[in-house]
Amino acid sequence: MTAISSWSELFEKRKKIKTLYPEIWDISLIKKEMDLLRRLIRDGIRILEIGAGDRRYEDRIKKIAPMVIYKSLDIDRETRQDYYDIDDIHETFDFIFMFEVIEHLTKEEAMVMLKKINSLLNQGGTLLLSTPNLYHPNRYYQDITHKTPFRYEDLGAIMLMAGFDSIKFHRMYNDDFFRRMFRIAIGIYFHKYMEVDFARTILAEGKRI
């Protein structure tokens, strides 16, 4: 049974996202995830990282806000985590982030995951996630374990359907200073003409309503 119960609702939510961001170029450009984490994290909040791997973000986060409570989830039991199954979590968080995970799920699994994440957030809590930018020519296809390509409008739509609000998107691109400036100031016209983006990653944030 599909977790997406209404395809007409999905299409309507997609239109809502496209109204906010008509084209990929309407999405703001940032250098790296930490630019957003610095803005979203503050001392004293409870944080869950999903797909934590080696927990490398724990130290980075605690340099920003030493008093945060950080918990991690990953299905790889060869790594050290607080949780290995999201259904084992019986506490709530102010901020949950999930980088390069959702594309490894089917669209139905992604909807179930987003609804579960929404239930783990305190009211007003924030989810931040990333996924390969489909407007980049080859970013998504560089990993054989990817299951679902998410355009930003589709990702935003299922986030809305899962109970999130105030959806915002960011494109992420970092490079050598001169190459980055060339791409942003001059190369952008070529990229727009070809309808391909140089930003490799899309980040989405949403709040629990």
Go through the PLM ranges and name each one.
Residues 139-158:
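Acceptor-substrate binding/catalytic loop of class I
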